[in-house]
Structures are given as structure tokens and as C-alpha cells.
């Protein structure tokens, strides 16, 4: 059989282990020289591919350099937020597949979240329509953990570890003074509160901070919120409150919109930020206590020093599994994670495949049964779910300047 080439791209927001998934795809691809002639990378995703921004991994990351991907945050190949047309009749599709043919592409991999799986769906359906032999596989990625039909996603474990660690550190800082204070920590999560829920992992004992966790799965009432804080001050001096950026009221209005209007991105998603600052001002004006807000922002997804070893290992495994599946003829699928336990009840994960058409444009939220009846905490079921995903540390090599050594695209 004539050799063909493999191409891989990254899309959407990066994570601390999206490059580990990339390493898994590339390293596995390079172990099949009898079948795969070249392993290419799309610089800036499908948008860069349109503009012929392509690299050959054997030239770009020779030898041991490839392994450096596993401790480098960000997206080595760069990213994009390009949305393919809904209609498969659009001329963009034949133009794309002409480029695939010119590059002798046999396998296409896209590492990303919900919108990226939409791209995988469209390309695989168009390939089937025209009888193209190209195999199209989606590799999951998102710190939001909101992809359906998978136990969890690569990137969530490391982001959850960062959130829990940072919340514990902020709690330690807030406890310095014996003066009533409220610290509000705003955490990423538009409609799904998985990452904010992970702040519960910071607690060292029952009743420890963060005392309040507000997720977008439950409507937020600012008057009830203020009453809850007043009651908590009867027993606690310093209160830590963790909120998802996407918390909203019963009418569906985002709390961040109380203070200002918000724009939208290329996919029509509202660009949320600022609910923490709004609540800070609310607490200060209504309760008359010291208030501070902290927005974790992009640091949640780019902390190499707190990469979960479990997350990294699973991301690499997913990348390798996807290549093996594609070589076996699979297409139009996303690699999924299936949770299992060994004979002693310890956490294990195995990979599976799911129809990408059942995944794209769907969203997995935190089950309401994992949120307490008062709406501002999570249950032990969530703790048991999330704790295995943050386990283990990795060693990040340091340079002569004492700072982490990452690999960069030239």
C-alpha cells in the first residue's frame, strides 16, 4: 500500500496538556514509517492550513526535542477559532480536500473542544460524501470538561489542580488578619461549572474555605448571596467565595452583565468576565466589609508547574490511541475516556471512541445531584470524581536563568 501523510492541528483555547496530546499523536505517527511517510502540523489550525502554514515534525522537533512538548503549556502549533460553513455545499470544502490531496494526506487529527469537534464532524461527513479515504479523528481538549460522552477531558485535571492549589494559597493569605473580609475568586466556566467546583478540593477539613461555591448550573440570587455571607460571618472572619464566570440569575442574565455589556466571539459565544468585580463592589457597598476579587483568568490553563501527572499521561495516551484507531480505519470519531477501577478499587482510565456527531455542539454540565440543595456547594460525589484527576506531579526542567525550559516554534 502506498504511503500517505498524517496532519494534526490544535484549535480553541490551549491547556497545560494540549501539547501532550500533540506529542501522543506525533510520536505514534512516527512509529509507523512503513505506512506514514510524513507527520505534518497545521500552524494555527485549519485557518493556517488554508494559508499553507505547515511544518514537518521531523524537521521542527528532531530527536529528544519532541518530548519537550509534554511539559510545555500553550499550543505549540498555535490555534485558531475558525468556524467551517454549515453547508457542505460551500466551496471551502472542495478547496480544503484539494489541498489534502496535494499533500497526500491520509489521516487528519484535530485537538480541541466542542467547536473543534464541529470541524471534525463536518470534514468527516464531507469526506464520506465524496468518497475520500481520509480518516478524520478528534482528540479532546478543554479545561471546561464540558464534552459529552467522555468521563472527562485532557486539560481539566491540570486546570483543576491549579485552581485547588491557588484557592488554598489565597485562603492562607486571607487568614492573616482578624478583620471581616470576603475574597471572591472568579474561575473560568461559561455554562459548565466543573472548574469552579474543583475549588472544593482545596479544603483541608469540613467547614474550611472556600465556604461558598457558585456554579452556572444553578441560578444566582444576589440577595440570598448577601444573606448567606452575613450568616457565615457569625462563625468565620474571612470568607472565600468561588464563582464561575458564567453565573446568571433566574432570568438567564449573566451577573457580569449587571455591570456592563459583553461582546461575542466568532462562534457567537459571549465573552464573559467581571462577575467577581461586580460582586466585590456589591459586598463592599451592602455589607460594609473588606472585599477583594481575584480573576484567575488564563493562568488556569497554562501552569506547567502544576501539571497533573495523571492528566499528562492520559493526554499522551489519547493521542496515541487516536492514531492507532485511524490506522485501523476509524473516522468521524472522538477519542473518549472511560473510567474504571482495579481489583482494589483504585482509579483507572481506558480510551474508547465516540461518534463525533453526537458530541459536537453538545455540552456536559455538572449534575445537579452533585450540587448541594442550598446551591452553593458540591457533594462528596464530585470530590470522588475529581480527586483522582489531579494526582501526581511532573518535573519541568529549568534553564540557567532558573525558569522553566519550554519548546517554541521558530
Where are these regions (language model features)?
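Glycine-rich beta-alpha junction loops
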Residues: 43-47, 141-145, 187-192, 216-222, ...
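Short glycine/serine/threonine-rich phosphate/pyrophosphate-binding segments
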Residues: 15-25, 49-50, 85, 93-94, ...
Amino acid at each position: 500500500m502506498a504511503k500517505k501523510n498524517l496532519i494534526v492541528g490544535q484549535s480553541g483555547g490551549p491547556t497545560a496538556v494540549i501539547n501532550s496530546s500533540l506529542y501522543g499523536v506525533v510520536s505514534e505517527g512516527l512509529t509507523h514509517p512503513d505506512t506514514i511517510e510524513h507527520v505534518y502540523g497545521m500552524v494555527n489550525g485549519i485557518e493556517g492550513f488554508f494559508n499553507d502554514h505547515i511544518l514537518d515534525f521531523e524537521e521542527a522537533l528532531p530527536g529528544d526535542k519532541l518530548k519537550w512538548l509534554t511539559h510545555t503549556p500553550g499550543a505549540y502549533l498555535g490555534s485558531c477559532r475558525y468556524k467551517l460553513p454549515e453547508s457542505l455545499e460551500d466551496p471551502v470544502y472542495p478547496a480544503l480536500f484539494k489541498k489534502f490531496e496535494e499533500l497526500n494526506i491520509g489521516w487528519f487529527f484535530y485537538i480541541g473542544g466542542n467547536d473543534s469537534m464541529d470541524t471534525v464532524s463536518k470534514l468527516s461527513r464531507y469526506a464520506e460524501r465524496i468518497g475520500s479515504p481520509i480518516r478524520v479523528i478528534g482528540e479532546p481538549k478543554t479545561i471546561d470538561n464540558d464534552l459529552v460522552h467522555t468521563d472527562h477531558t485532557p486539560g481539566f485535571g491540570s486546570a483543576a489542580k491549579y485552581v485547588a492549589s491557588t484557592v488554598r494559597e489565597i485562603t492562607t493569605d486571607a487568614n492573616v488578619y482578624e478583620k471581616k473580609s470576603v475574597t471572591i475568586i472568579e474561575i473560568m466556566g461559561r455554562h459548565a461549572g466543573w472548574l469552579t467546583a474543583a475549588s472544593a478540593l482545596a479544603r483541608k477539613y469540613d467547614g474550611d474555605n472556600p465556604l461558598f461555591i457558585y456554579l452556572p448550573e444553578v441560578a444566582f440570587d444576589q440577595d440570598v448571596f448577601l444573606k448567606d455571607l452575613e450568616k457565615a460571618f457569625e462563625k468565620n472572619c474571612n470568607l472565600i467565595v468561588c464563582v464561575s464566570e458564567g453565573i446568571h440569575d433566574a432570568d438567564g442574565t449573566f451577573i457580569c452583565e449587571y455591570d456592563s455589556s459583553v461582546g461575542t466571539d466568532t462562534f457567537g459565544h459571549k465573552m464573559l468576565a467581571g462577575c467577581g468585580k461586580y460582586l466585590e463592589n456589591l459586598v463592599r457597598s451592602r455589607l460594609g466589609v473588606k472585599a477583594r476579587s481575584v480573576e484567575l483568568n488564563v493562568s488556569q490553563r497554562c501552569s506547567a508547574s502544576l501539571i497533573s501527572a495523571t492528566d499528562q499521561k492520559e493526554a499522551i495516551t489519547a493521542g496515541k490511541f487516536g492514531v492507532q484507531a485511524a490506522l485501523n480505519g476509524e473516522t468521524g470519531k472522538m477519542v473518549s475516556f472511560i473510567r474504571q477501577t482495579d481489583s482494589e478499587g483504585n482509579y483507572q482510565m481506558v480510551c474508547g471512541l465516540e461518534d463525533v456527531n453526537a458530541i459536537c455542539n453538545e455540552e456536559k454540565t455538572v449534575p445537579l445531584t452533585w450540587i448541594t440543595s442550598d446551591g452553593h456547594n458540591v457533594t462528596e460525589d464530585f470530590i470522588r470524581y475529581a480527586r483522582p484527576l489531579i494526582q501526581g506531579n511532573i518535573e519541568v526542567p529549568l534553564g540557567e536563568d532558573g525558569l522553566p525550559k519550554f519548546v517554541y516554534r521558530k
